[in-house]
Design a protein with these regions (language model features):
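Short, Lys/Arg-rich, polar N-terminal cytosolic tail immediately upstream
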Residues: 1-12, 317-333
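A structural signal for multi-pass alpha-helical bundles of membrane permease subunits
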Residues: 11-299, 303-305, 340-627
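Cytosolic-side transmembrane-helix boundaries in multi-pass membrane proteins
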Residues: 292-327
Length: 627
C-alpha cells in the first residue's frame, strides 16, 4: 500500500514561508539583542575585570546598583538632568512639528523649499558637528536671551520659570533641528485626512480652532505618541548625551566596584529602565479617554447644524465696501485672508532662517582671518576672505582618508540593512503565522533599548568572534535585522508592502514563480520608494554614528570622528603654538574649527541637495506613518 504523500495545508505553508522570511531577524534577535541584554544584566551583578587571558567575574549581587545610587551618583544626577531636558524637548519639538506640519499642509508657495530646509539637519548633523557648534555658540541666536519678556516672566512667575524660558531659548535651534522627521511624519498624516470632514465641520459652524481640537488632533493622536517615543529614543541615543558618555567612560576604567564593565552595565540598566518607564507613562497618558475618541474619516452620519452661529447686524456686516475689504484682509474663514497669510509667511520664513543660521554662521566664520577673530569690531562678516583656514582644516582632518573611511563604514552596512529589513518586512506583511503579533511587539520593543545596554556584551562578543576593529561589527548585525534603527526600517517595509495588492503575488505564483522569485521580481521593484528611503537613512545614520564606531572600531578615521579629534590632530600637524605669542597665524582658532566642521559635513551636504527630492518625498511615499 502506497503511503499518502504529505502535503502542507495553505495555513501551514503560510507559516513556513513567514518564518522563512523573518528567520534572519529571529537569529539576529537572539544573537545580537536577546543574549547581549541578558548577559548585560548578568555582568551588572558582577565585578568584571578583563585580563589578557579572558574575562574574570566575581559575583557581588546588586552592589554596583547600590554604589550608583549611594556613592558615585554622577550618572544618576546627570540622568535627572537628562529626564528634565528630554521631557521639555519632547513636548516643544512635537508641538512645533505639529504647527509647522499644518502650515506646510496649507496651500502656500515655496512649500518644497521650506520642507527641504526643515529636513536638512536630520541628514547632516552628527554628535561632533553639534558639539563644535555648541562650543562656538553657533546654535544660539545672538541676543535671543536678552529679551525683556524673560525678565518680566521671572518677576511674575519666579526665577525658576525665568531660567526655564532662558533654557528654552538657548536650546531653540537644537529643538528645531531635532524636529525634521516629526514634521514630515505629521505632514504625511495630515495629507491622508479626508477633506470632506473639514468641509462638514465648517458647514456646522466650527472655527479653525475647533476643527483642530475636535477633528485634527484626535486623528493624529496615535502619531503624536509614536513621534514622542521616537523623540525620546533619538535624544537618549544621541552621541552628545552626557549619560551615555559617562557610561562609556566607566566601562573603560578598572574592574573595581564603581568602575569597569560591571558597573557600566549596571548604569546601562538603570538608564534602560528609566527610558522604559517614560515610554510606559506615555502609553498610559495617551490611552486616557481613548475609548471616547471618535476618529472621523468620512462624512457619513456627520451631524450638520447651520443655526449654531447667528451674525449680528453691525456697520461692518451692512456696508458692502467694508465687507469686501474685511473679506480680503481676514478671509472667509479667518485663515485664508491676507493678514493670516502674511503672518504665516513671516513665521515660516523666520523659522527657516533659524534653521539656517548655524550654517550661515559656520560659512562666514570659517572665512575669517586670525586678525578678524581677535578684532572685536569685526562681526560675523569677515573683512577679507581667508581660505587658509580650509587648507589647514583639510590637512588636519585628512579629508580623503576620512572620506574613504566614512564611505566604507556606511555603505556596506546600509546595503545589508536594506536587504534584511526588506525580507523581514515582506514576511510580516505577506504571511500569517503563529506568534506574528508577538514578533511585531518585540521588534517595536527593541527600538527603545539604549545602545549602552548592548555595547558591553557585544563588545566582548565581537572581540571573541574576531570582528572587533573592523566594519564587520556593523555589517553582521545589519545583515540580521539588528542594525542601527532597524526597527524603523522594518516597519517602513512592512507598511509599504501592505499597500501592494497581494493579487500580484498570487498571479506570479500561478505562473510558477517561487516565493523568493515573487519577492525579488514582483514585489521589491514596486517598493523602490521604501528601498530608497531605507538606504539613504541607513547610510546617513551609519555615517554620523560616532559613539559605537569609536567603541567597536578603535582608530577608525571617519569625517565625524576626525572632527571630534580636530584639536589633537591640529597640534600634530602644526605644533602646539603658544597662544600668547605674537605669531598666532598657526594657532587653532574658531575660524579653523568652523572650516573643519564645514569640511566634515560637505559630502552629506552635497548628497542631500543632490538627492533631497528622494530624501523628503520618499518619506511621503514609503508609508512611514502607518495606519
Amino acid at each position: 500500500m502506497m503511503k499518502k504523500k504529505f502535503r502542507l495545508t495553505f495555513k501551514q505553508r503560510e507559516s513556513v514561508l513567514g518564518y522563512m522570511f523573518i528567520s534572519l531577524w529571529i537569529i539576529g534577535f537572539f544573537v545580537f539583542t536577546f543574549y547581549p541584554v541578558i548577559y548585560s544584566f548578568f555582568l551588572s551583578l558582577n565585578r568584571v575585570t578583563i585580563p589578557t587571558t579572558g574575562i574574570d567575574l566575581e559575583f557581588i549581587g546588586f552592589a554596583n546598583f547600590q554604589h550608583a545610587f549611594a556613592i558615585d551618583r554622577v550618572m544618576i544626577l546627570e540622568l535627572g538632568t537628562f529626564i528634565q531636558d528630554a521631557v521639555l524637548m519632547m513636548v516643544i519639538i512635537n508641538v512645533f512639528a505639529v504647527i509647522f506640519a499644518m502650515i506646510l499642509n496649507m496651500d502656500i508657495k515655496f512649500k518644497g523649499f521650506f520642507r527641504t530646509i526643515f529636513f536638512l539637519p536630520v541628514v547632516i548633523v552628527s554628535g561632533p558637528v553639534m558639539q563644535e557648534l555648541l562650543n562656538n555658540n553657533a546654535i544660539i541666536l545672538p541676543g535671543i536671551t536678552n529679551f525683556q519678556v524673560i525678565s518680566v516672566f521671572s518677576s511674575i512667575f519666579g526665577e525658576s520659570f525665568g531660567e526655564l524660558i532662558v533654557k528654552v531659548f538657548n536650546n531653540l535651534i537644537s529643538m528645531f533641528w531635532f524636529s525634521g522627521v516629526q514634521i514630515i511624519v505629521y505632514l504625511v498624516m495630515l495629507q491622508k485626512m479626508n477633506k470632506e470632514v473639514y468641509e462638514a465641520s465648517e458647514i456646522d459652524g466650527a472655527s479653525p480652532w475647533e476643527q483642530f481640537w475636535k477633528v485634527t488632533l484626535p486623528f493624529i493622536k496615535p502619531i503624536i505618541l509614536i513621534n514622542m517615543i521616537y523623540t525620546l529614543v533619538m535624544l537618549a541615543g544621541f552621541s552628545n548625551n552626557r549619560v551615555i558618555i559617562i557610561i562609556k567612560d566607566y566601562m573603560l576604567k578598572t574592574g573595581e566596584v564603581g568602575a569597569g564593565f560591571g558597573f557600566s552595565a549596571a548604569l546601562s540598566w538603570i538608564y534602560f529602565l528609566v527610558i522604559a518607564i517614560i515610554v510606559v507613562l506615555l502609553f498610559l497618558l495617551f490611552s486616557l479617554g481613548r475609548r471616547n475618541i471618535k476618529y472621523i474619516r468620512n462624512t457619513e452620519h456627520f451631524h450638520l447644524d447651520m443655526t449654531r452661529y447667528t451674525e449680528k447686524d453691525t456697520f461692518i456686516n451692512k456696508n458692502p465696501t467694508v465687507k469686501k475689504i474685511r473679506k480680503k484682509l481676514m478671509g472667509r474663514k479667518g485663515t485664508d485672508g491676507w493678514v493670516f497669510r502674511l503672518f504665516v509667511y513671516l513665521l515660516i520664513a523666520s523659522v527657516a532662517f533659524t534653521f539656517l543660521y548655524p550654517f550661515i554662521y559656520l560659512a562666514l566664520t570659517s572665512l575669517q582671518s586670525p586678525e578678524d577673530i581677535i578684532d572685536a569690531t569685526v562681526g560675523l562678516v569677515p573683512r577679507t576672505i581667508y581660505f587658509e583656514n580650509y587648507v589647514k582644516a583639510f590637512k588636519t582632518i585628512g579629508f580623503f582618508t576620512a572620506l574613504e573611511g566614512s564611505i566604507r563604514i556606511s555603505l556596506l552596512p546600509a546595503l545589508a540593512q536594506v536587504f534584511s529589513t526588506a525580507l523581514i518586512g515582506y514576511g510580516l506583511a505577506r504571511f500569517d503565522f503563529k506568534l506574528k503579533k508577538l514578533v511585531v511587539v518585540i521588534i517595536l520593543f527593541t527600538f527603545i533599548i539604549p545602545a549602552p545596554v548592548l555595547m558591553i556584551p557585544t563588545y566582548l562578543m565581537y572581540r571573541d568572534l574576531g570582528i572587533l576593529g573592523n566594519v564587520g561589527s556593523f555589517i553582521y548585525p545589519a545583515l540580521f535585522g539588528q542594525g542601527l534603527k532597524s526597527t524603523i526600517f522594518i516597519m517602513i517595509f512592512y507598511q509599504f508592502f501592505n499597500t501592494i495588492p497581494k493579487v500580484l503575488d498570487e498571479a506570479a505564483r500561478v505562473d510558477g514563480a517561487g516565493p523568493i522569485r515573487v519577492f525579488l521580481r514582483v514585489t521589491l521593484p514596486l517598493a523602490v520608494p521604501a528601498v530608497v528611503v531605507v538606504f539613504l537613512f541607513s547610510f546617513v545614520w551609519y555615517w554620523n554614528e560616532t559613539y559605537l564606531t569609536g567603541l567597536y572600531i578603535d582608530g577608525a578615521r571617519t569625517l565625524p570622528l576626525q572632527l571630534s579629534r580636530f584639536a589633537a590632530s591640529f597640534r600634530e600637524q602644526f605644533g602646539n603654538v603658544d597662544p600668547n605669542a605674537e605669531d598666532f597665524v598657526d594657532r587653532i582658532n574658531e575660524a579653523i574649527y568652523m572650516a573643519g566642521t564645514l569640511i566634515s559635513i560637505l559630502p552629506l551636504l552635497l548628497m542631500y541637495f543632490g538627492l533631497q527630492k528622494w530624501f523628503v518625498e520618499s518619506v511621503d511615499r514609503s508609508g512611514i506613518t502607518g495606519e
